[in-house]
Each structure stands twice: as C-alpha cells, then as structure tokens.
C-alpha cells in the first residue's frame, strides 16, 4: 500500500535547498501553505513575483523584469558573486547583469576616453585664446582706421560678417616736425657713422687681403678698400671739426689722460726752456678766460704780497682740488700764442720777497759752480706712469737752459692746509742752471749745464736718471760734462729787473734775499704727496768731502714719487744744437740706453718706502753718493770765503756757532 506524504511535511529533496537559500519563514508555516501566503502577499503589494522565488528554477533571467529594479543592490551583487565563485574564482563575468564592472588602466576603453576628454579641453582653451587675440587685433585695426580713415586688410572678419565703416576722428591729420625727428646730437650721429665706417673699412681690407683672387678681383677690392678709407678719413676730419666748433670745455676740465701719460721722447727740458724776449719788461697779459674770482698775479716784485692764511678764514681745500692749466711752455714746437694762459694764475709763479733765509729754505754747500731753480711739477704726476725711457737731451741744448719753471699753486701750505693724504716719502730734485741766468756779479764759470732728476718709470730726465733702490744690484748712471760758456741771455720769468734776484718758484719760501745766492749746486727737497708750494731748497751739508780736493760732495737725494716730465723740444729749436757733432749725440744715446737697461732691472717695490738711494758713477762724471741723513738734521751753513777756483774755504754754521776752515 502506497504511502502519501502529509500536507504539513516538506519533501525530502526540498528541505536542504530551502535551508541552503536561508530564506526566513514565520514560525509554524511550512509546506505549500507558506508558499501560497508569500505569493499572495507579494501580489497584494502590486509587485510581480520574483523569478528566483520559484521552487523549480534558481537561475537568473537573461532579461530582468519589472521587479528587478526594486531588488536591493546588495542582493544582486551577492547573487552574482555567488555564481561567479561557483563557475570560476579567477575570472569575473560581465554577462550576468549586462553592466561592465571593470575599470582603471586594465580596461581597454577607459584610456581612450580620458585622452579624448583631454584633447577636447585643450581645444577649448586654444579657441578661447584665439578669440582673445582676434578681439585685440580688431581693436587695433579700428584704432588705425580712426587715424588713417581706411580699415586695414588685416581686420578679421567672421563668416558672413561685413567690414565695419569707420570714420576718421577730427584732428587726427597732422605732420611730424622734421626738427623733432632729427634733433639728436650731431656729434653722436657722426660717432655712430664713424664706428660703422670703421667696420666697413676693416671688412674691405680683409677682402682685399684674401688669397686665391684673380687680378681683376684683387684690383677691384683694392679700389673699394681705398674708397672706404677715404670715407673714413673724411668722417674723422668732420668729427674733429665738429668737436672743435662745439662749445669748448672749461679750462679746469682739461682731459687728464694726456697729462697723465708721457711719450717716449719726453724729457724735463720741455718744461725748462723759457721763451726769449728782446726786452726785460713782459708784455701786459691779454684778457684771461679764467673766472673773474681768480685775479691775475702781479708781474713785479713791488706788486706782490705775501701769501698766507687770512685772519679768521676757514681752512682751504687740499691742493689736489686746484686745477692745472696748460700753458704755451708745454708746446715748444708751436709759436708763442697770444693768450692769457702763460700769465694766468694757474700757470704763473707766485713769488714774494723775504728778508732772509727761513727755516724751510736751508742752503747746503757744495764746491760747485751752479745755481738752482726748482723743477716744475705737474699735478697728477703722482698718478701717471709709463714704461718707456725718455729721449736723452743733448748737452748743447742743456747748456742753454736758463731756468726751470715750477708749476704754481694759488696759495702756500699755510693757506691751503695740509693734505689729507698720508705722505709717502720726500723727494730731492737736483737742478743746475748756467750763471748767465743771474746778474753779472762775477764772471760766469765755464762749466754750466742744466741737470735735473726725477723718479718716473716712463718719463726720464735730461741728465740724471733713476737711482737704485737699497738692495738693488743695478746702479744708475748720472753724467755731467763741461760745456762751453753759454751766451748771456735775458729771459722773462727767471729774474726780474727789480734789483733783486727772484727764484722762479711758486712759494715765498723758495725766494732769496737780494745778494744772497751763492754759486753752487743745490738740492730741491720735496714731499711727493705735497704741492710744490711746500718744497724746500737745501745745500749739501759739509762733510768729509772738504778734507780732500778730489772727492766729490755727497748729496742727500730721495726718490721722487711718479714725477711727470713733458717732451723734449726739437733740436731745430736750439741754434747751437745744429752744430753738434755725431760723437756727442752718440755719447748721449749710449748713456740713455744704459740708463734704460739698468732701470728695467730695478725693482720698484721700494718706491713707496722713502729709501735713500746710492748710485755708482763712471770715471770722469760727477755723481751723487749716499744720503747724509734726514733733512731735519742738515745744518744751515753760510760760505764766508771761497778759493779762486770757487771751492769753499771758510764756512759758518749758525746752529753750532762754529766757523769751519779748510786747510
């Protein structure tokens, strides 16, 4: 007998599946009754029965129904994941739900979409920039059309757009002034043309010097080069004339480059020779271009007043602020110019008589027959140096040098004040002039020459060159040869006919009282950083040289600091120089080259130490030996009696109150 299952029992094959699905039921409801209640509840809610609620099918439909959208997403993902794990754990299916679940760089569609999006974004940015540029172009074209009355062809038109009509603004028509266009400096225009022509000429010269050219081409290039050179010379000439015709610069602003350098033919004699005149009375000076605040100095001793600081006046500026004016004496090759420069205050010596020798004008004795006049110094000589030696000066021309002119300063050291710069070292200038410069109180001595010395690596002197530094092995040569007695000339600027001897200097301390100028060689002592107004004249102190007749007197001489010497005048200026023998010229040239060779090996490291220099001399030439000591220790001496040959026999020393006689 067959057994039928009970209604409230679950078939044995379905119980495990219901438990596996884990669907909750109300307690007490089992079997078909529970299924019917669940179906009825879903139908009353208005929803269709879900496909997976059927007992016979557990597969998801290929096409979801109306109830699929209301299904919770968690349930959908759980079902999809459950099936994928059953089919393959390593592969994710994209056919269950019809939605691509893959994303990121592994997806074959995503990089292309991203690239397309970036390109579209860049295109939109470029289009916006192009539109802005076109708008700016339209605005500029409209402004131009308002000025000219015509719309430019560059005006951008949109598709189907017509060109706008623009009317010119009132007052927009005008003409530019030619003067406003060409009001630039003509000098600058000429300079630019000259610079361009220099380059063109250089290019033409290089083309002419090229190799492997035919005769015709070489001739043409040479002709072109000559034409360009002519144009260059014409431009240079026009530029020089234009500069000359332009407004002249003030006298105080002369270019210093020319004053700070000396050429190879520089020598001290350019500043030594004074212009000769038939009469002793100088001509009245013409109108001076100097400012009216600088009065001209008087030309006679009677009109001169002692220069010094005024009472209650503030201290003046240092000496370096006073300008130096070029004079006609600096151009010996030119004819005397009728200008006020030689007699202006900046170039004329300021002299003042004194009653007697002061403490700063100490005269040191030496048994020689020469007088001294200080050397003319040039402001800026402590700045400029050159390396070439100077041309030697012929002795015949030196014998006719009557005096040296010292560059003047407008006030002495008391009025000008001490320089703010530290002193480097004292400087000695040894100068000798013939007796023809002085009144004929006694017959002129036969050995008269003009010698000077300075320390300059490029501007040498006429007779005495560089001394050697302490520790230097290179001696320096100094020479002095006797000459024939020069003719007596009267020169302006050296000695005035006022009954007293006037030293051509710029400071009252350099003057001597009437009748007090004993014949002999003197040493000009100067501080290099100081103006020439603070120079002092000294004579060498008596020493062991008086014990022997043949022993030359030693001099105290310190190295000058960068003295600037000007050119040597031509031999054609000196009538006596034309008859010089070739032997004399060769001798001078030989000693000049010897000095240049020795100076090239001399170390310059001791130039700033104020060291005393010792010089060795050849036979037959006068020389200067070792310094006797600081100038503060040199006593003042007076010659009481001389021998017939001019040597001092009896000397009085005021400091010690002694009379020294030579036996």
UniProtKB/Swiss-Prot annotation:
Residues 327-340 have a biased composition (Basic and acidic residues). Residues 282-298 have a biased composition (Pro residues). InterPro entries: CCDC120/INAVA, CUPID. Changing residue 340 to A: Decreases interaction with YWHAQ, cellular signaling pathway activation and cytokine secretion. Induction: Expression is induced by the component of peptidoglycan muramyl dipeptide. Negatively regulated by microRNA-24 (miR-24). Residues 118-147 form a coiled coil. It is found in: Nucleus; Cytoplasm. One of its GO terms (biological process) is innate immune response. Residues 350-361 have a biased composition (Polar residues). One of its GO terms (cellular component) is nuclear body. Keywords: Coiled coil, Cytoplasm, Disease variant, Immunity, Innate immunity, Nucleus. Highly expressed in intestinal myeloid-derived cells and expressed in monocyte-derived macrophages upon induction by PRR activation. Signal peptide: none annotated. Residues 1-68, 242-362, 378-425, 444-493 are annotated as: Disordered. A motif (Nuclear localization signal (NLS) 1) lies at residues 164-170. Expressed in peripheral macrophages and intestinal myeloid-derived cells, is required for optimal PRR (pattern recognition receptor)-induced signaling, cytokine secretion, and bacterial clearance. Upon stimulation of a broad range of PRRs (pattern recognition receptor) such as NOD2 or TLR2, TLR3, TLR4, TLR5, TLR7 and TLR9, associates with YWHAQ/14-3-3T, which in turn leads to the recruitment and activation of MAP kinases and NF-kappa-B signaling complexes that amplifies PRR-induced downstream signals and cytokine secretion. Interacts with IRAK1, NOD2 and RIPK2; the interaction takes place upon PRR stimulation. Interacts with YWHAQ/14-3-3T; the interaction increases upon PRR stimulation and is required for cellular signaling pathway activation and cytokine secretion. Interacts (via N-terminal domain) with CYTH1 and CYTH2 (via their N-terminal domains). Interacts with FBXW11 and BTRC; associates with SCF E3 ubiquitin-protein ligase complexes. It is linked to Inflammatory bowel disease 29: A chronic, relapsing inflammation of the gastrointestinal tract with a complex etiology. It is subdivided into Crohn disease and ulcerative colitis phenotypes. Crohn disease may affect any part of the gastrointestinal tract from the mouth to the anus, but most frequently it involves the terminal ileum and colon. Bowel inflammation is transmural and discontinuous; it may contain granulomas or be associated with intestinal or perianal fistulas. This is Innate immunity activator protein. It comes from Homo sapiens (Human).
């Amino acid at each position: 007998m067959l057994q039928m299952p009970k209604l409230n029992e679950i078939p044995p094959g379905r119980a495990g599946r219901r438990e596996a699905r884990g669907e909750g039921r109300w307690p007490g409801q089992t079997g078909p009754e529970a299924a019917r209640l669940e179906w009825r509840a879903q139908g009353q809610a208005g929803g269709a029965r879900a496909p997976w609620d059927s007992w016979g099918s557990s597969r998801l439909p290929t096409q979801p129904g109306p109830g699929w959208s209301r299904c919770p997403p968690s349930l959908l993902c759980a079902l999809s994941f459950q099936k994928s794990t059953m089919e393959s754990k390593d592969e994710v299916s994209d056919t269950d739900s019809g939605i691509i679940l893959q994303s990121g760089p592994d997806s074959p569609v995503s990089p292309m979409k991203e690239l397309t999006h970036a390109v579209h974004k860049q295109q939109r940015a470029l289009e916006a920039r192009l539109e802005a540029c076109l708008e700016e172009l339209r605005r500029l074209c409209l402004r131009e059309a308002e000025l000219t009355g015509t719309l430019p062809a560059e005006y951008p038109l949109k598709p189907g757009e017509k060109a706008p009509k623009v009317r010119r603004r009132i007052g927009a028509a005008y003409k530019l002034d030619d003067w406003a266009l060409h009001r630039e400096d003509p000098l600058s225009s000429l300079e630019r043309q000259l610079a361009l022509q220099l380059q063109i000429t250089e290019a033409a010269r290089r083309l002419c010097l090229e190799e492997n050219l035919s005769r015709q081409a070489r001739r043409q290039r040479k002709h072109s080069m000559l034409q360009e050179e002519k144009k260059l010379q014409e431009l240079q000439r026009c530029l020089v004339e234009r500069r000359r015709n332009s407004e002249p610069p003030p006298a105080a602003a002369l270019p210093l480059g020319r004053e700070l350098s000396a050429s190879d033919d520089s020598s001290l004699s350019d500043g030594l020779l004074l212009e000769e005149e038939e009469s002793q009375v100088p001509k009245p000076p013409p109108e001076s271009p100097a400012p009216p605040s600088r009065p001209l100095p008087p030309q006679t001793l009677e009109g001169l007043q002692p220069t010094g600081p005024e009472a209650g006046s503030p201290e003046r500026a240092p000496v370096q602020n006073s300008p130096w004016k070029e004079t006609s004496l600096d151009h010996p090759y030119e004819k005397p110019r009728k200008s006020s420069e030689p007699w202006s205050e900046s170039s004329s010596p300021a002299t003042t008589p004194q009653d007697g020798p002061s403490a700063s004008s100490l005269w040191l004795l030496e048994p020689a027959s020469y007088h001294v006049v200080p050397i003319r110094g040039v402001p800026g000589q402590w700045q400029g140096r050159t390396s070439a030696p100077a041309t030697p000066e012929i002795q015949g021309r030196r014998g006719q040098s009557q005096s040296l002119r010292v560059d003047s300063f407008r006030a002495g050291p008391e009025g000008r004040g001490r320089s703010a710069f530290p002193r480097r070292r004292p400087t000695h200038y040894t100068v000798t002039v013939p007796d023809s410069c002085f009144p004929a109180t006694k017959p002129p001595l036969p050995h008269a020459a003009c010698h000077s010395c300075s320390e300059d690596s490029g501007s040498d002197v006429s007779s005495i060159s560089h001394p050697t530094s302490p520790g230097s092995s290179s001696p320096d040569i100094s020479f002095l040869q006797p000459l024939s007695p020069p003719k007596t000339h009267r020169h302006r600027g050296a000695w005035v006919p006022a009954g007293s001897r006037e030293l051509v200097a710029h400071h009252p301390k350099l003057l001597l009282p009437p009748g007090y100028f004993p014949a002999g060689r003197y040493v000009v002592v100067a501080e290099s950083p100081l103006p020439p107004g603070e120079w002092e004249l000294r004579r060498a102190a008596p020493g062991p040289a008086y014990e022997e007749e043949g022993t030359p007197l030693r001099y105290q001489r310190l190295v000058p600091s960068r003295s600037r010497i000007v050119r040597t005048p031509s031999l054609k200026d000196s009538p006596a120089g034309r008859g010089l023998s070739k032997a004399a010229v060769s001798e001078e040239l030989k000693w000049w080259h010897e000095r240049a060779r020795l100076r090239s090996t001399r170390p310059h490291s001791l130039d700033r130490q104020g060291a005393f220099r010792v010089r060795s001399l050849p036979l037959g030439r006068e020389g200067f030996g070792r310094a006797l000591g600081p100038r503060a220790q040199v006593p003042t001496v007076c010659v009481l009696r001389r021998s017939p040959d001019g040597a001092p026999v009896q000397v009085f020393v005021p400091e010690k109150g002694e009379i020294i006689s030579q036996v």
